[in-house]
């Protein structure tokens, strides 16, 4: 099923929407809580509410392999969602809530692998507390003001991202790609940077706080 250019208002999507496509649609005061959206595609869609203090709810929804491209999702709640394999490309996710969502497939309690694709998105002030984003594609995002406390991004591609200087040290980034990222505020004495990739020009911002001169 394919919806194009349609407007939905005040609708609770409790039916099965797996693999359904929505293109350039507008969702006003709609509720996707616990919706079955696995494999669905949203392109150029806007999700808005009458209450300016909260966004659209995808709480506890099944968004496995769901695609959001160029969508307006500011303040949306993905709390508790099952999101393994989900992708967000060029989306406005400012202030979105991803707490308790799952983007990992657990084989055992200590063995798992992660899958989520977030690229070119505005993630300012979004809440990712405790998330597992290991070895995921997370390039060219704005992370300023986001809550990254306890997040594991080990092995992830964070290249060309924009981070707040005070966020360094709140999350794990061993073996990740930090090329073309402003590393101001990152203290190499307080973080495990094993295997981290950077560009030559980034060395100065890491070493100058130690009194070293890169020439």
Set out the residue ranges of the language-model regions.
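Tandem repeat scaffolds
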Residues: 1-215
């Amino acid at each position: 099923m394919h919806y194009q250019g349609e407007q939905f208002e005040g609708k609770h999507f409790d039916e099965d929407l797996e693999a359904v496509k929505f293109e350039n649609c507008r969702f006003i005061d709609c509720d996707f809580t616990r919706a079955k959206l696995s494999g669905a595609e949203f392109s150029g869609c806007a999700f808005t509410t009458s209450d300016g203090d909260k966004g659209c709810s995808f709480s506890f929804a099944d968004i496995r392999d769901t695609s959001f491209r160029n969508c307006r999702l500011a303040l949306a709640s993905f709390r508790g969602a099952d999101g393994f394999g989900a992708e967000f490309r060029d989306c406005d996710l400012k202030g979105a809530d991803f707490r308790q969502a799952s983007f990992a497939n657990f084989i055992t309690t200590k063995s798992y692998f992660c899958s989520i694709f977030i690229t070119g998105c505005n993630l300012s002030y979004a809440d990712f507390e405790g998330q597992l984003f290991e070895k995921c594609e997370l390039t060219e995002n704005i992370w300023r003001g986001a809550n990254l406390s306890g997040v594991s991004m080990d092995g992830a591609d964070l290249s060309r991202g924009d981070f707040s200087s005070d966020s360094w040290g709140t999350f794990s980034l061993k073996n990740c790609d930090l090329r073309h990222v402003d590393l101001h505020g990152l203290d190499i004495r307080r973080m495990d940077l094993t295997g981290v990739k950077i560009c030559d020009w980034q060395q100065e911002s890491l070493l100058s706080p130690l009194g070293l001169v890169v020439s």
